[in-house]
Each structure stands twice: as structure tokens, then as C-alpha cells.
Amino acid sequence: ISHKNELLVFKGPNRLSVHRITGSSPTGADAFARVPFVTGVGGINHNGLFRINDDLVFPSPRGIHSLAATAAFGDYVEAFLARPILSHYQDSLNHSALSTNWGVNFQSKGLAIWSFAPSGSSTKSVYLVYDYRFQPGRWASWGINTPYVAANCLAVMQTTGRKHTLFAGTEGGYVHQLTVSD
């Protein structure tokens, strides 16, 4: 992903790392090069990686991370974005299906939302929601006790009334509008 005039490559899910791609040409004095940025933290897929304001957020097998916090503190657990819900993330989600997660920035509401499969299921029916309007951010979960709409994918789209609306696409080909009111 391109972020702040840098090209970043997230490696995972086994050998976790983030790398910078430097250079401006395939050969010569300014040839492309891969420079390690951090090890021990990396992305598990491109669908869960997105921007929040001036930062990137992404899930890994170890938790949900902020690139800014990772740059400052590395893989220090206390700096994980999902630190307040880390035991839930590590104990209650299906880790063999983590790579199928989907995330979206619902910017008009100040929410970062990811869909995950709970333990014992391959259906992504649990949503982890990070409200970044507050400092520190606040976490919530939709579908933790009762499955929510199974979301194979998530999207925020602008309706004809210029209102941003959250949608979930299911494996059966249906699209559900998740935003029902302000």
C-alpha cells in the first residue's frame, strides 16, 4: 500500500513483517530495494488493511495494529491497537480463518470495522468495531453472543441522498444494509 509517499509491503501470516520499497527505478544508482521496517508484526490480508486519518490499521495473527504505534514501539504488546480486547481477539476468533477477514473505515461515523469468524465457525459473523473519535479509542463487538449478519465483505457507499451507508455482502450473493439510522 502507498502511504505518506512510501510503498509498504505487509508480509504474513507466518513470518510477520512490514517492509518499505525504496528507489525510483529497476536499475542504477536509485534502484528499487526492500528495506525491513518492523518484524514480529505484519498483515494477514489486504482486505483488512485501511487508512484511519493519518495512520494505517491492520489485523495480524497477534492482534489489530496501528502503523504509527508499530513504528514507534515495534511488536510491543502494550502498543497494539486492540490491546483492550486482545484476549477476546486471541481466544474467541477462528485463527485458521483470520486471513478471510474484511475491514472498512466508516469515516462519517468514526468507526473502523472488521468482520471475523468466531471460534468453531468459518462464517464471518462477528464484527470488531473501533471508535476512533475518542482518545483512547473505544472497542465494541457486534455478534459476540448472537451471530450478526454474515459478512463475506464490507463496504461503505454513498446513497443517492449523499448519506454514507454500511453494507455487508454475504456468501449467498445478498447485500445487507447495516446502517439503519443515525
Language-model-derived ranges and their functions:
Residues I1-D182:
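Beta-sheet-dominated scaffold domains
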